[in-house]
Swiss-Prot record:
It comes from Arabidopsis thaliana. May be involved in the conjugation of reduced glutathione to a wide number of exogenous and endogenous hydrophobic electrophiles and have a detoxification role against certain herbicides. SUPFAM superfamilies: GST C-terminal domain-like, Thioredoxin-like. The modification Phosphothreonine is found at residue 154. Belongs to the GST superfamily. Tau family. This is Glutathione S-transferase U28. Its EC number is 2.5.1.18. Residues 91-217 form the GST C-terminal domain. Keywords: Cytoplasm, Detoxification, Phosphoprotein, Transferase. It is an enzyme of class 2 (transferase). CDD domains: GST_C_Tau, GST_N_Tau.
Length: 224
């Protein structure tokens, strides 16, 4: 059995936008995989053993070898399953540009950034979180422009990096009392376009389900 055909397992938590990246990438490549859902409050021995440094999902296990960090996993998937189209452009300059924007999205549109909105009651800290979130989205929207995807007509690396957070927009809007579409209509249109892809539709949870999870987190962290 070739390496690209051996068993693939994702240690997952359904609401994790980072784990969603990995699952979207695998589905884009047509790779069959198993999902092991993790209880993040009672992590499995397999998760702790597979990712001893960060102890976080997602972990991609391929041929019994664990790989941590979602963007590293997406690159690994791209380099391992080469029969399907690459997530990155062929020329070095365009690849570098895509990596720059994926890195920007990863650093600015994040779980921690979202927590500044849902993890605070209405007030100065939440307003600061909203401002930072929307400013970053507007930078990404300017880069997207009128293109179908960040890579033009091709769904790729930057799209895979950012699209999981589309499923969190509704929860952030509800907690922060704002509209992403009013501020960044092209980003929302892009998100809707991405969800038309089977890989994304099969991966992203319903926005209401994410919102209910966020309400639980607010209770756990004493926000409510």
């Amino acid at each position: 059995m070739g390496k690209e055909n051996s068993k693939v397992v994702v240690l997952d938590f359904w609401a994790s936008p980072y784990a969603m990246r990995t699952k979207v990438a695998l589905r884009e490549k047509g790779v069959e995989f198993e999902v092991q859902e993790e209880d993040l409050w009672n992590k499995s021995e397999l998760l702790l053993k597979s990712n001893p440094v960060h102890k976080k999902v997602p972990v991609l296990i391929h041929n019994n070898t664990p790989i941590s960090e979602s963007l590293i996993q997406v690159q690994y998937i791209d380099e391992t399953w080469t029969d399907a189209a690459s997530f990155l452009p062929s020329d070095p300059q365009s690849r570098a540009t895509a990596r720059f924007w994926a890195d920007y999205a990863d650093k600015t549109i994040s779980f921690e950034g979202g927590r500044k909105i849902w993890g605070n009651k209405k007030g100065e800290e939440q307003e600061k979180g909203k401002k930072e979130f929307l400013e970053s989205l507007k930078v990404l929207e300017a880069e997207l422009g009128d293109k179908s995807y960040f890579g033009g007509e091709t769904f790729g690396y930057v799209d895979i990096t950012l699209v999981p957070f589309y499923s969190w927009f509704y929860a952030l809007e509800k907690c922060g009392d704002f509209s992403v579409e009013a501020e960044c209509p092209k980003i929302v249109a892009w998100g809707k376009r991405c969800v038309e892809r089977n890989s994304v539709a099969a991966t992203l949870p319903e926005s209401e389900k994410v919102y209910q999870q966020v309400l639980k987190l607010r209770q756990i962290f004493g926000v409510e």
